[in-house]
């Protein structure tokens, strides 16, 4: 939990999911403060749009202006809602939209936390282009090291004249004025052929490894089991290539695709529809924080390529939560399969949670592990 005094109100903020007390990560950063400083004496007219507000620092500070919080992270939405409640602010003060929704017309102010991926930034800037005016104040912020020439060029190309500020507390801002530059349309997804399958994989802007199959997933696909039945889960599904492979290898099974990114879940749905339409009735698609709210003892198997970062921060908290959720939702003798970088040492984490862990395969970079739910051990 961390405290920020932003000139609008004094806030107490925490990350979601929370980090441990030994190595705490802040729920806000200098770029949030810097952005809010720019508005301290500015009269705000028209809708306020906030993009990629990681844990609600901006939304909480500007709640009296009824802002729209726009992003591609259900975890960020949950974190923002929790911080609103924690600071005594009505959740209804903020309207939440995902990045593929239509943005409100003629906003007075747009605040952007620059996302990790340039593709997501371009998608969001193109969406803003349809609604902003020359009078809209557009300000973006990030750590100075995360604002590159390519970032500034993208603002210039999509929206118009762009300048950057001096660094402050290692953060930097981007100021942009909309001038309606000429810009050709761009496809909503990036597509590529998946070798040895005949499948075409479609990827929305914020999908992990959207330009090609990542090497961890490729290794995982070589060792997926066959002849499973019942319900199985592609947890943290991304574009759904693991779930697609499971559908093809296990014609008696139903596959549940789960991710906290609406773009990932939409990509998975599109990839099943276009590549295995006959299997679509065996699928469920879920935007969720891991398996929160899912009934226990439901699944026969869970497959996971867990992230070890959240936005720009390195953390294993999300993976840890995924493992605990998987154990709760597996049937007795149900199996969790994961692929991970060898250096992360998930073997001992899984053994601590499940009481057992086995190595299925390994190479010089990745390891595939299996843990089995035995009895009712917590």
Curated annotation (Swiss-Prot):
One of its GO terms (cellular component) is cytoplasm. It catalyses: guanosine(1835) in 23S rRNA + S-adenosyl-L-methionine = N(2)-methylguanosine(1835) in 23S rRNA + S-adenosyl-L-homocysteine + H(+). It is found in: Cytoplasm. GO terms for molecular function: 23S rRNA (guanine(1835)-N(2))-methyltransferase activity; nucleic acid binding. It comes from the Bacteria. Its EC number is 2.1.1.174. It is an enzyme of class 2 (transferase). InterPro entries: DNA_methylase_N6_adenine_CS, rRNA_m2G-MeTrfase_RlmG, RsmC/RlmG, SAM-dependent_MTases_sf, Small_mtfrase_dom. The gene is rlmG. Keywords: Cytoplasm, Methyltransferase, rRNA processing, S-adenosyl-L-methionine, Transferase. Belongs to the methyltransferase superfamily. RlmG family. This is Ribosomal RNA large subunit methyltransferase G. It holds the Pfam family MTS. Specifically methylates the guanine in position 1835 (m2G1835) of 23S rRNA.
